[in-house]
Amino acid sequence: MKKNIQQTVTELVSPVVESLNYELVDIEYVKEGANWYLRVYIDKPGGISIDDCQAVSEQVSDLLDKDDPIDQSYFLEVSSPGLDRPLKTEKDFAKYKGELVEVKVFQPIDGKKIFEGELVGLKDNIIVINQDGHNVQFERDEVAIVKRVIKF
């Protein structure tokens, strides 16, 4: 049920978000405590401001009120995915190629579940990072999450 809501909302709001010149990065529909949250993550070159979030929130809220794809009450949140956003799409992997990433796997590989290295890319569902001069490959379905590592 939750996945269907995410897919339905994605299909519904994606054209609106794109028409406002933003990228729809992800949608989450989660329960926290007694409340449900619909989180819409957007991005654009140069980053996202509060005004950007407000503009998208107003349009998406109006659309969701009209089409009403969710039965129960929920809170709508629109935000940036953050600097350490998870990489999910082929576009994400292409965009952040050459950057430092952290790969977390479901099952340990040689006793490790977390790997850090430079993102080489994603091809044929194989994620490749360069770790200390050696390419390390991961089957995409073995990977729990890939996210950027931000060094300050």
Swiss-Prot record:
Q: SUPFAM superfamilies from the xrefs?
A: YhbC-like, C-terminal domain, YhbC-like, N-terminal domain
What Gene3D superfamilies does UniProt report for this protein, alphabetically? Ribosome maturation factor RimP, C-terminal domain, RimP-like superfamily, N-terminal
Keyword Cytoplasm tagged? yes
Q: Name one GO cellular component term.
A: cytosol
Q: Which GO terms describe its biological process?
A: ribosomal small subunit assembly; translation
The transmembrane segments are none
> Has keyword Ligase?
no
Q: Which Pfam families match?
A: DUF150_C, RimP_N
- Purpose of the protein: Required for maturation of 30S ribosomal subunits.
Which PANTHER family does the annotation name?
RIBOSOME MATURATION FACTOR RIMP
Q: Which family does it belong to?
A: Belongs to the RimP family.
Q: What is this protein called?
A: Ribosome maturation factor RimP
Q: Which organism is it from?
A: Ruminiclostridium cellulolyticum (strain ATCC 35319 / DSM 5812 / JCM 6584 / H10) (Clostridium cellulolyticum)
Per the record, the gene is: rimP
